[in-house]
């Protein structure tokens, strides 16, 4: 009887650890996605004419986007489809290769943009590849906000 209770207690503890780990990965990816969103804000302000072009800020933002894009695919394991507050659509796991490829393309676009953006004109001419990759992922793999 004591062995049975100990076994059940152990399974409950293991199960709760799984739930916490699952929630942790969701929290991690949400934090990185928020960080990426924050990195785009100064660029968007420059594009709208709300802020003066600042190459150092653009470079820092693009570096953050490239770096974060490389981390994100690992933060969408199959066991994180449910169990937390997430806007991730099931399509992510149905077409994980395409999803992961979009992050690779985003990282490549951000890295390439770092090499080509030197002023306001080149920002406007070259940022589309970065922002387009963001949009593709949001359109296909993120639940729409209501």
Curated annotation (Swiss-Prot):
The lineage of its organism: Bacteria, Pseudomonadati, Pseudomonadota, Alphaproteobacteria, Hyphomicrobiales. SUPFAM superfamilies: Cytochromes. The keyword Oxidoreductase does not apply. It comes from the Bacteria. Keywords: Electron transport, Heme, Iron, Metal-binding, Signal, Transport. It comes from Rhodopseudomonas palustris (strain ATCC BAA-98 / CGA009). Residues 1-21 form the signal peptide. Binds 1 heme c group covalently per subunit. Cytochrome c' is the most widely occurring bacterial c-type cytochrome. Cytochromes c' are high-spin proteins and the heme has no sixth ligand. Their exact function is not known. GO terms for molecular function: electron transfer activity; heme binding; iron ion binding. GO terms for biological process: electron transport chain. Monomer. This is Cytochrome c'. GO terms for cellular component: periplasmic space. Heme c binds at residues 29, 86-87, 134, 137-138. The keyword Plastid does not apply. PROSITE patterns: CYTCII (PS51009).
């Amino acid at each position: 009887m004591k062995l049975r209770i100990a076994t059940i207690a152990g399974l409950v503890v293991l199960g709760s650890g799984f739930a916490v780990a699952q929630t942790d990965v969701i929290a991690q990816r949400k934090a990185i996605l928020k960080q990426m969103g924050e990195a785009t804000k100064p660029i968007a302000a420059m594009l709208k004419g709300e802020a003066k072009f600042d190459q150092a800020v653009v470079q820092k933002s693009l570096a953050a986007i490239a770096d974060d894009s490389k981390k994100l695919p690992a933060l969408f394991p199959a066991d994180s489809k449910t169990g937390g507050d997430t806007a991730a659509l099931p399509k992510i796991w149905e077409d994980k290769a395409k999803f992961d490829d979009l992050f690779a393309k985003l990282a490549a676009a951000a890295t390439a943009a770092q090499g080509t953006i030197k002023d306001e004109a080149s920002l406007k001419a070259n940022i589309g590849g970065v922002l387009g990759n963001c949009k593709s992922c949001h359109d296909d793999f993120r639940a729409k906000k209501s």
